[in-house]
Amino acid sequence: MKLTFDLDGKIIFSKELSEEAKNAVEEVLKNADSIFLKGVPKGKENEASKIKSYEFEGNILKLKIASGTYTRAHEGLIRLRKPLAEKLGRNFRIGVRGIEIDNYVITIETDEDKAKKLEGIKVPECEAKVEGNKIILTFKDIGESELKRNIIDRAIKFVKTELEKEEEDLTFKVCKIPPGTIVSEYKAKRKITFDKDPTDVAEKLGWVKKFPGRGQWFYTPPITALFRALEELIVEEVVKKIGFQECLFPKLIPLEIMYKMRYLEGLPEGMYYVCPPKREPELFKEFVNEMMIKKEIPIEKLKNLLRDPGYVLAPAQCEPFYQFFEGEVIDVDKPIMFFDRSGWTYRWEGGGARGLDRVNEFLRVECVWIGSPEFVEETRDKTLKYAEKLAEKLDLEYWVEVGDDPFYLEGRKKEDRGIEFPDVPKYEMRLWLPHIKDERKGVAVTSANVHGTHFVEGFRIKDYKGRRVWTGCTGYGITRWVVGYLAQYGFNFDDWHPIIKKKIKKLPEVPQLITWPKKDE
């Protein structure tokens, strides 16, 4: 499958550009390759974005950008914003007002037979047509709100899924209620007036600062206080009331555990793999010497000093729980209920990482339990019910829907071990995001899963009387609870819910540097 991208777009400035300002813009455009090639694998440079032409028109820079799969043309356009804003803001006090795409043609080449099956396909947000072995998607008049909603990549994913759809995902075969069905909801009693993107506001106020790693942030004292307040409430009002006991789970997970979980079958591209170093001090000395002389990191040399991948950074947080019980015999009349909140969870979102709600590094309170099927399903229901009660106590607007991507089934097409599955593998609780106007969208803050015998079989766990054993887990995404809370309450501490204010007492201040946070021009 080959993808090509051809974009006509524009960057809108706060005022018309002088000749000197145009020259400054052209300097950035001449160095665009270094901007576009960041993160592109070696040998794939020709598939990154390239500027085909550009012209100035008043306060607008019009651009034609083409690309292959890597740093897709719309990503290239977005990447230009920051260096242009920095250069023009610093030297000419000109800001970037917005980014727009006038016309965007994406061509997906595949086998002609596969393409033919998609004739007449309706793809949300764009026009789609099939010509021979090509599916052509055309987007028109795309603004920043659509780009933030990731509609382009979602449309491509939709088409690719349709092309590859030889059989349904296992989730859809197993689930007795159609994924996406809303099973409960709550409307806020107060009038919600805040309608800005919490990521934009948090960054502007200095509550967060971008970290160099993709999908990572530095969280400063004010937002950290909110993190801790919500975490404490979830532990006090939900987790401990149900009866979970706290443990400290490892976060560096051996690959063989992921294999036994079958996680490597479903989402192998969604993890950070860890390579231990070879214990060869002399070779590392060469690496250090070369780095000191060249003033850059010799990556190729470093690769040769690393062993094969042996671990992943925990992508689900519950992995150690199943390993704890491997080969053990339990009594389902004495179920085990643990929870962990001891560190970060890591998932590689790739190009999907955006804002504070979809990050590669995030905090969660993870509950995991084992017992009889009846106990496991009852406990899952409690983990949802108590979370709903907390949201209502805080007057947070939410809904609960049947999930379409339980982590242990995601991406998998079949199961050949005779596993017992629940009628509903996953429920997902979402907090409403009022700043997204085009559709009613929520951030998933709680994921409540029942696994049936999936992990019991994989880790050879038995009951001493031969009775059925199931497992379940619920993750409370603290990072996303924070995003949902700020999206509905805003950043004025006086407007926050009394329960949160009582927890925090006095909101810490943002550290003030000479150069940060940036002041409004």
Curated annotation (Swiss-Prot):
Cofactor, free-text remark: Binds 1 Zn(2+) ion per subunit. This ion is coordinated with 2 cysteines, 1 glutamate and a water molecule that dissociates from the zinc ion to allow the coordination of the amino group of the serine substrate, which is essential for catalysis.
Is the Transferase keyword given for this protein? Answer: no
Q: What Enzyme Commission number(s) apply to this enzyme?
A: 6.1.1.11
Keywords tagged on the record? Aminoacyl-tRNA synthetase, ATP-binding, Cytoplasm, Ligase, Metal-binding, Nucleotide-binding, Protein biosynthesis, Zinc
Matching entries from Pfam families are given as: tRNA-synt_2b (PF00587), tRNA_bind_4 (PF18490)
Q: Where does ATP bind?
A: R347, W348, E349, R358, V359, R480
Q: What is its main location?
A: cytoplasm
Q: In which pathway does it act?
A: Aminoacyl-tRNA biosynthesis; selenocysteinyl-tRNA(Sec) biosynthesis; L-seryl-tRNA(Sec) from L-serine and tRNA(Sec): step 1/1
Q: Where does Zn(2+) bind?
A: C318, E366, C473
Give the required cofactors: Zn(2+)
Residues that coordinate or bind L-serine: A316, R347, R364, V365, E366
Q: Which GO terms describe its molecular function?
A: ATP binding; serine-tRNA ligase activity; zinc ion binding
Report the CDD domains cross-referenced here. Answer: Gly_His_Pro_Ser_Thr_tRS_core (cd00670)
**Which reaction(s) are listed as its catalytic activity?**
tRNA(Ser) + L-serine + ATP = L-seryl-tRNA(Ser) + AMP + diphosphate + H(+); tRNA(Sec) + L-serine + ATP = L-seryl-tRNA(Sec) + AMP + diphosphate + H(+)
Q: How is temperature linked to this protein's activity?
A: Thermostable. Fully active at 80 degrees Celsius.
One GO term describing the cellular component:
cytoplasm
Q: Name one GO biological process term.
A: selenocysteine biosynthetic process
Location of the protein in the cell: Cytoplasm
Enzyme class (EC, first level): ligase
Transmembrane helix as UniProt keyword: no
Instruction: Please describe what this protein does.
Output: Catalyzes the attachment of serine to tRNA(Ser). Is also able to aminoacylate tRNA(Sec) with serine, to form the misacylated tRNA L-seryl-tRNA(Sec), which will be further converted into selenocysteinyl-tRNA(Sec).
Q: Which family does it belong to?
A: Belongs to the class-II aminoacyl-tRNA synthetase family. Type-2 seryl-tRNA synthetase subfamily.
What does the subunit comment say?
Answer: Homodimer.
About its domains, the entry says: Consists of two distinct domains, a catalytic core and a N-terminal extension that is presumably involved in tRNA binding.
NCBIfam families in the cross-refs: PRK00960.1 (NF002120), serS_MJ (TIGR00415)
**Protein name (Swiss-Prot/TrEMBL):** Type-2 serine--tRNA ligase
Organism expressing this protein natively? Methanocaldococcus jannaschii (strain ATCC 43067 / DSM 2661 / JAL-1 / JCM 10045 / NBRC 100440) (Methanococcus jannaschii)
The taxonomic lineage of its organism, from the top, reads: Archaea, Methanobacteriati, Methanobacteriota, Methanomada group, Methanococci
Gene from which this protein is expressed: serS
